[in-house]
Amino acid sequence: TDVRVVLPTPDEPFYSDDTPWYRKDKRYQVLYLLHGAHGDCTVWTRNTGIERYAQKYKLMVVSASVTNSCYVDMVHGGKFFTYMTQELPAFIESTFPVSTRREDTFIAGMSMGGYGAFRLGLAQPERYSCIVSLSGAIDLVLQTRKTSVQMEDVFGDQPMDHTDNDNLWKLEQLIKQGVSIPKIYQCCGTEDFLYESNQNVRRKLEQLGVDFTYDEGPGIHNWDYWDPQIRKILEWLPLKGTLVDA
């Protein structure tokens, strides 16, 4: 599959002095940024200013194309959960100067990618310190009859509820096990077709007592909403604005 990586460049002073471009004792914080249904690894760079924002914060951004897989190992299709949890992180960490510390690693996504951010983040809470959903189909158990994604190809014909593909059930199990839950940021436009679903998720998060931030405002399911939101999210994330120690 295809991967797009945004790697910030050094600031202008390197043109006029002998400062090394990349220091071996420094690493980038990293955001895994997920696309939605019918998207690919290019949608964030084509439709938002994420390259400029990443440069400002000295943040590495990684996006991968996963078709309409919902970021799981499809019953009839690619094994994208395995790819996103094992193969892609191993490639990124062995190829680029990226921090592997939990406090420097974040995951976010819009629409189907919001589901994916929860699915992957809750599967590896030891890897990610923050999970972000923008207009996400977080609770796909309630959405399976309202989507253009071919769910039988993705999940088969077995019920999703009370399985690892049921994000809210999975979250509840982790809490019961005493697992450290990543901080959560959830946002949705008030005119979005997923608004009511996000309200249900919000109420469940409040009920579970997790550490989460919720934001809503005028907007539908499009990039006019997601571009300003990703800027707000980058302000919310614990970004250093510079490289971190290796």
PLM features: what roles do these ranges have?
Residues 1-246:
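Non-catalytic cap/lid and distal C-terminal segments of serine-dependent acyl enzymes
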